[in-house]
UniProtKB/Swiss-Prot annotation:
Entry GO terms, CC: periplasmic space
UniProt xrefs under Pfam families: Trehalase
Subunit structure: Monomer.
Active site location: D312 (proton donor/acceptor), E496 (proton donor/acceptor)
Name of the molecule in the record: Periplasmic trehalase
Region annotation (Disordered) ranges: 538-565
Gene3D superfamilies, per the entry: 1.50.10.10
Origin species: Escherichia coli (strain 55989 / EAEC)
Substrates-to-products reaction catalysed: alpha,alpha-trehalose + H2O = alpha-D-glucose + beta-D-glucose
Family: Belongs to the glycosyl hydrolase 37 family.
Length: 565
């Protein structure tokens, strides 16, 4: 049912007002904002294109991460002079003028370690800093050490980090949690948002917005002081996601904001650039060329925006699951993103109240309530009985069930009866022997069946627990942990994703080989171990038999997590 006409303008006016207040509060920092670093494809122009197209390296990310040894303009000038000379060797030119990223030493864990001991031993192995960042490096400097995912991912990633931080907190490493929150706050202050990762070529997009949840996690240890300290950065990130809303008319979209015909405001994923991704240059060009019926720039934008979603790639964004060139991320309103935006608004309300600004707290509560109504109206498929994404082209909720449907439960935005239906749908369609399936579609893309990802296992587990669905939550945790344990027993490592159709097998598909390490798997595994085992009898390995719900911890524990006065 539509809202009464007189109240709508008043509600919508709150959002621009909030955004302007957020910017006003932070305007003192504007003069300190440095010039945005340019990505390597812009700095190096035709040289970058030629190197990537020559496929000098098996992974396109290698040259994107390479550091110029001198001014890129001088290197480019030298290249233009030399490239047509007889005997010119492109690989030699690259080796002379660039420092390539070093391959990390393969970590060999000590013999006889339990799963918990292995993870605790990995935190220092995965910790990095940017103390030695050079002027032309694509790596963006950060003030504090940080934990990377592992493998080819040599930098910090936005949404990965939240699930890594859950594990750091579980291990009692609150200093590392605080460092990572400080780093992300620094990025917001410096660039106006948190980029996909701390690389210049990631600056044109963000990722699922977990910063407010990171601050909330830190507040478990530091109390409301953390909420008050990082309120300005949370406000500034919210302004980034809502940028352009004040000029939107009904039925329009601007960057990351969507205004539906009835005035409902929701968000979508978006990348400010519409060119091939430097880290996947050749692959993106090939994808665009394979569909001549669409402008290449449109495909590039949708590829980049899918990377912003964290789900790169998935049938979720595609008209034809077998053809990546049919993806249209920017015309889809994602249920997980809008759940996170709801949670951001709720945490902003809490932080504003802690800071003594009740008027602002009430504004954020109003925004959260309006978004919750939008989620229930547009992102619920009543015919199927599950949450789903909204299609801006068909003006209908989509039919596909994905693990993203659990996000409204995770942030407590779901109606009770709908949460119960989600539990049934999850158990019927997504639960597999090795954990929760990402989707039920086999497309060959990594964010589809049969792959299961640690963050989605945790979101589902927590979300179902929030609504009393503890048996299904235990099933997910137990099946996924068994998969992790079996893989660890055989290979002595934790990996980025798992094949959930069985147990003990890493996942496949996507643009690169399976990566090990792995930050968010480590974090979620620790949280789940402490969830399924009683507090008085913590387990260091996954029990051989499924624990009963009564014997398990009723709420996830976090070491030393009591708020400090």
């Amino acid at each position: 049912m539509k809202s009464p006409a007189p109240s709508r303008p008043q509600k919508m006016a709150l959002i621009p007002a909030c955004i302007f207040l957020c910017f006003a509060a932070l305007s003192v920092q504007a003069e300190e904002t440095p010039v945005t670093p340019q990505p390597p494809d812009i700095l190096l122009g035709p040289l970058f294109n030629d190197v990537q197209n020559a496929k000098l390296f098996p992974d396109q990310k290698t040259f994107a991460d390479a550091m110029p040894n001198s001014d890129p303009l001088m290197i480019l000038a030298d290249y233009r002079m030399q490239q047509n000379q007889s005997g010119f060797d492109l690989r030699h030119f690259v080796n002379v003028n660039f420092t390539l990223p070093k391959e990390g030493e393969k970590y060999v864990p000590p013999e006889g370690q339990s799963l918990r001991e292995h993870i605790d031993g990995l935190w220092p192995v995965l910790t990095r800093s940017t103390e030695n960042t050079e002027k032309w490096d694509s790596l963006l400097p950060l003030p504090e050490p940080y934990v990377v995912p592992g493998g080819r991912f040599r930098e910090v990633y936005y949404w990965d980090s939240y699930f890594t931080m859950l594990g750091l907190a579980e291990s009692g490493h609150w200093d590392k949690v605080a460092d990572m929150v400080a780093n992300f706050a620094h990025e917001i202050d410096t660039y106006g948002h948190i980029p996909n990762g701390n690389r210049s070529y990631y600056l044109s997009r963000s990722q699922p917005p977990f910063f407010a949840l990171m601050v909330e996690l830190l507040a478990q240890h530091e109390g409301d002081a953390a909420l008050k300290q990082y309120l300005p950065q949370m406000q500034k990130e919210y302004a980034y996601w809502m940028d352009g809303v004040e000029n939107l008319q009904a039925g329009q979209q601007e960057k990351r904001v969507v205004k539906l015909q009835d005035g409902t405001l929701l968000n979508r994923y978006w990348d400010d650039r519409d060119t091939p991704r430097p880290e996947s240059w050749v692959e993106d060009i090939a994808t665009a060329k394979s569909n001549p019926n669409r402008p290449a720039t449109e495909i590039y934008r949708d590829l980049r925006s899918a990377a912003a979603s964290g789900w790169d790639f998935s049938s979720r964004w595609m008209d034809n699951p077998q053809q990546l060139n049919t993806l249209r991320t920017t015309s889809i309103v994602p249920v997980d993103l809008n759940s996170l935006m709801f949670k951001m608004e709720k945490i902003l309300a809490r932080a504003s109240k802690a800071a003594g600004d009740n008027a602002m707290a009430n504004q954020y509560e109003t925004l959260a309530n309006a978004r919750q109504k939008g989620i229930e109206k547009y992102l619920w498929n009543d015919q199927q009985g599950w949450y789903a994404d909204y299609d801006l082209k068909s003006h209908k909720v989509r039919n596909q069930l994905t693990a993203a449907a659990l996000f409204p439960l995770y942030v407590n935005a779901a109606a009770k009866d709908r949460a119960n239906k989600m539990a049934t749908a999850t158990k019927t369609h997504l639960l597999q022997p090795g954990g929760l399936n990402t989707t039920s579609v086999k497309s060959g893309q990594q964010w589809d069946a049969p792959n299961g990802w640690a963050p989605l296992q945790w979101v589902a587990t927590e979300g179902l627990q929030n609504y009393g669905q503890k048996e299904v939550a235990m099933d997910i945790s137990w099946h996924f942990l068994t998969n992790v344990q079996h893989t660890y027993d055989r290979e002595k490592k934790l990996v980025e994703k798992y094949d959930v159709s069985t147990t003990g097998t890493g996942g496949g598909g996507g643009e690169y080989p399976l990566q090990d390490g792995f930050g968010w798997t480590n974090g979620v595994t620790l949280k789940m171990l402490d969830l399924i085992c009683p507090k008085e009898q913590p387990c260091d390995n996954v029990p051989a038999t499924r624990p009963t719900v009564k014997s398990a911890t009723t709420q996830p524990s976090t070491k030393e997590a009591q708020p400090t006065p």
